[in-house]
Amino acid sequence: MKLIIATRKSQLALWQSEHVAQILKNTHQIEVLLEGFKTKGDVLLDSPLAKIGGKGLFTKELEESMLRKEAHLAVHSLKDVPSFFPQGLVLAAVSKREQSNDAMLSQNYKDFLSLPKGAKIGTTSLRRKMQLLLLRPDLDIISLRGNVNSRIEKLKNNDFDAIILAMAGIKRLNLDKQVNFVYEFSKDELIPAASQGALGIESINDEKILELLKCLNDENALIETSIEREFIATLEGGCQVPIGINAELLGDEICVRAVLGLPDGSEILKDKRMIKKNDFKGFGESLAKEFIAKGAKELLKKAESMI
């Protein structure tokens, strides 16, 4: 049997798809091919993600290729995957999670506190912008789009004093070797995006294919990301609004951190809970409902009007 993986053409997307292809080849001794596509999010690089809006910026074209029967599966950064899938497609697996926290890359400053007043910080994310300004209102947060290599190039050209990336991508592409300093944020400093660090394998709804993809599943990643995705789905928040949610398994307990608010950090809702591992089902939804009772929907609407 031959499997075809639909993938974006960015360096990180290709790494992720090759990684999954290798596991499938080794486990099942089958042929696995990659088919590259450009998504809307890859093409529209002049505008901040939040302004482009819409769900599935990095997934829609890959999903369409599967629905046209040109591919059997697609490998996504799970944080880019909307909560609901087109008919005929399913979330087949969530693979073992890489580190889920964010990090600061810089040529001149070894950590976040050493950044000078007014330092220029590059990031695509309103979630990061909101939390960075909470920690350091004196910073200048500037929108930064493009692939990872072009972002690092801009940093080296001194367009920015620092840029913020997900630690998972830094590790997968060995980006720490390309810059002088990498400062890892704790999850209390910067709450990550839902499902950050996890790969989501989306596939056609076919029994044989789903059986082959079972080997990619990781139970811990499934538990953590199900809480996070449930929280986002209940709030109806896409990746363009400032929401952070992270569930971290610690033995038989789970630490859940959540934050949302306005991009400038002037108004936020934030919480941190410890729950029993066995109580994870439905917790994301119930936490989101508590946030809604405190005015989360109104706050997110206000955030959208500021974008």
Swiss-Prot record:
Keywords in UniProt for this one? Answer: Porphyrin biosynthesis, Transferase
Q: Report the EC code(s) recorded for this entry.
A: 2.5.1.61
Its UniProt entry gives the catalysed reaction(s) as: 4 porphobilinogen + H2O = hydroxymethylbilane + 4 NH4(+)
Gene3D superfamilies attached here? Answer: Periplasmic binding protein-like II (3.40.190.10), Porphobilinogen deaminase, C-terminal domain (3.30.160.40)
Primary role = Tetrapolymerization of the monopyrrole PBG into the hydroxymethylbilane pre-uroporphyrinogen in several discrete steps.
Family assignment? Answer: Belongs to the HMBS family.
Q: What protein name is recorded for this chain?
A: Porphobilinogen deaminase
Encoded by which gene? hemC
